[in-house]
């Protein structure tokens, strides 16, 4: 039976994951801070994180289900659908190759507060620069992307293996720098998240399969539902926001949050020694 405090922890972390996973502000840093504040850690937390990340990506699948069906059923007779699928697979492959080769090394040597904070601040500065530079739009819709756009964004996504970089942040900034409109860059980031995050969740789920215990099912289910709902809210809100605003607000938030993380480490406010990513 799940007690009130455990239910509260599951809901809070589900909300944090759902709201931050697809915003360019690094869900990793937020999860570590909040989990430490509410005392949710250990092996159970590692398994729980896999579940709520899977819920977040399924929210995106649901939100873009019409486009997904259009592409799937158009593969046999629509060049546009085949080109989009090819671009998605091309952008996905660099993360697969580099992830398999370097994921464990990165988690061992780079998962620390200094790296997370530096990645947040540097990413924020680059985001400000990308927004303020003259932006020549070559692609206004994801269906019009060329393979070269997809491949470059795929390599940029690999930077998100560095904790604090933010997967969505790196792909969105990359899209803007390579000539995509804000809408196209954001939507392609969402679509690219589907195979990337599902693949990562399956890999992590298999690697840490011994951590999943039947008694944790109620906690996992509550976190899953919460993460799903708030991820959907975040995705819809972001798409509406970028229609009339730049990413500057997120950039400044990253910089401030990065400095805050440095403070939590410097003054011992958060126990970073138990962080697993």
Curated annotation (Swiss-Prot):
Gene Ontology cellular-component terms listed: plasma membrane
EC number(s) given by UniProt: 3.6.1.27
Keyword annotations from UniProtKB, A to Z: Antibiotic resistance, Cell inner membrane, Cell membrane, Cell shape, Cell wall biogenesis/degradation, Hydrolase, Membrane, Peptidoglycan synthesis, Transmembrane, Transmembrane helix
A GO BP annotation: response to antibiotic
InterPro entries: UppP
GO molecular function: undecaprenyl-diphosphatase activity
Keyword check for Cell inner membrane: yes
Highest taxon of source: Bacteria
Enzyme class, broadest EC rank: hydrolase
Transmembrane segments: 44-64, 86-106, 110-130, 184-204, 215-235, 250-270
Subcellular location(s) of the protein: Cell inner membrane
Function text: Catalyzes the dephosphorylation of undecaprenyl diphosphate (UPP). Confers resistance to bacitracin.
Miscellaneous section: Bacitracin is thought to be involved in the inhibition of peptidoglycan synthesis by sequestering undecaprenyl diphosphate, thereby reducing the pool of lipid carrier available.
NCBIfam families referenced in this protein's UniProt entry, alphabetically: PRK00281.1-2 (NF001389), PRK00281.1-4 (NF001390), undec_PP_bacA (TIGR00753)
PANTHER family with a match to the protein in the record: UNDECAPRENYL-DIPHOSPHATASE
Family: Belongs to the UppP family.
Name this polypeptide is given: Undecaprenyl-diphosphatase
Organism: Pseudomonas putida (strain ATCC 47054 / DSM 6125 / CFBP 8728 / NCIMB 11950 / KT2440)
